[in-house]
A protein has these predicted regions:
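Short, solvent-exposed loop/turn segments enriched in Ser/Thr/Gly
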Residues: 33-38, 129-133
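Sec/Tat signal peptide C-region and signal peptidase I cleavage site
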Residues: 16-21
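Extracytoplasmic/periplasmic copper-protein system
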Residues: 32, 138-175
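Low-complexity, intrinsically disordered segments enriched in Ser/Thr together with acidic residues
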Residues: 99-127
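Low-complexity, serine/threonine/proline/glycine-rich extracellular segments that form mucin-like
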Residues: 35-73
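Beta-strand-rich interaction surfaces with strong enrichment in secreted/lumenal proteins
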Residues: 26-27, 89-90, 101-107
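Bacterial N-terminal signal peptides that target proteins for export
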Residues: 1-9
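A surface/secretory-pathway sequence property marking extracellular, secreted
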Residues: 62-98, 165-173
Length: 175
């Protein structure tokens, strides 16, 4: 009985450590037509190497993006046209931020940090769906591509060498 408890506990802990090893959003759900502060949590580097760059692709319908600068990191903002117009405070938006990156810093593998931006979840987004923020994490040695997006009906995605899911945000009904 005790051995089964230990084996079961070890399995749960192993699953938890794998799940917490991914880059994730602090708040993983928010209502459409609302402001959203995205806090991207980076819990580790690449196989022991320090993180030197984080690049985030902004999904369609996440508009009005404003990144938070980080001391010691260079911030780069890429803007472009949206696939369709979105409404922001009564005005139609046809272009905006499509990618953010922080580079030139050094986050040792033994430490944790967060990369933050504010945004608006457009009223045109559909409640009940999930939007994904693909992230590329570059390190002194190596790279992680947290870009896997599950197909409809799947619970996760599998990349080379194991799961590398993109952080997801579940859209709740408008308040």
């Amino acid at each position: 009985m005790f051995r089964r408890f230990i084996a079961g506990s070890a399995s749960v802990l192993a699953a938890m450590s794998c799940a917490s090893a991914h880059i994730t959003l602090e708040q993983q759900q928010a209502p459409v037509a609302s402001s959203y502060k995205a806090v991207m949590r980076v819990p580790h580097g690449c196989d022991g190497a320090a993180t030197t760059s984080i690049r985030i692709r902004i999904p369609e319908g996440v508009i009005g993006v404003k990144p938070m600068p980080k001391p010691g990191w260079q911030l780069n903002v890429v803007s472009g046209k949206y696939a369709k117009p979105y409404t922001l405070r009564g005005a139609k938006m046809t272009e905006g931020v499509t990618e953010l990156s922080w580079s030139g810093g050094k986050l040792p593998d033994a430490y944790y940090d967060e990369f933050v931006f504010t945004s608006v979840l457009a009223e045109e987004l559909e409640a009940g769906k999930t939007v994904y923020f693909p992230v590329v994490q570059e390190c002194e040695k190596g790279i992680h591509r947290w870009i896997e997006i599950p197909k409809d009906g799947e619970h996760g995605a599998q990349g080379e060498g194991g799961p590398q899911p993109a952080p997801g945000l579940r859209l709740l009904p408008k308040r």
